[in-house]
Amino acid sequence: MYWEKALSEAERALAILPPSPKVSEFQNIRSLFPYIHTPSPLQEVSTEIQLNKIGAQLFILEDLTGSGKTESALTLAKRLMSSGRANGIFYALPTMATANAMYSRLVDVLSKLYLPGSKPSLILAHSRSRLMEGFTSKIWDNLLKGSSEFNNETPVYAGCASWFAESSKKALLADVGVGTIDQALMGVLQFRHNNLRLLGLEKKVFIVDEVHAYDAYM
């Protein structure tokens, strides 16, 4: 009885979600960030560094404040996605305030990661995400599929289906996410449904920002 009920609920959940977005080809850093006219040395490296053909990769980006580390990290992420090594991003930060600020920045980049016409989901993942109006205003209602709002006749781009936002354990399943580092760490700790978090991180570029500030939060 439970299995049949779970199957029907899973089908209903999948019917709500838009199809998986297709990643676009990487062109150059200005295609992601038009305001960059002269890339910094770190940003140039992010567009040129060789990617391994197989296996996981670790990149450590360290530079002065204002050197464009965020743009460099997202450029590398875009290159990894375009080469077929990933299909999404999770951007981890130490605090809810820094995650909120990064969410606003990712809204502008999201459409440039995927092909035109795609509807990738962007989630803000932390325990107080519902208090950020910039996020809650972009949550698609479960009944919106096929409606004028979902179909972009009313602009709600760079949002996510409410199914993702109902629970933090499902948040990492969105195509692109930004949140506090604990949302990812709970995937490897003894929390309920930790395997669901790991599934959400699979095939994603995992960016850890502000590393120097994590001691107080881990």
Q: Which residues are covered by each model-predicted region?
A:
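N-terminal helicase ATP-binding lobe
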Residues: 1-218
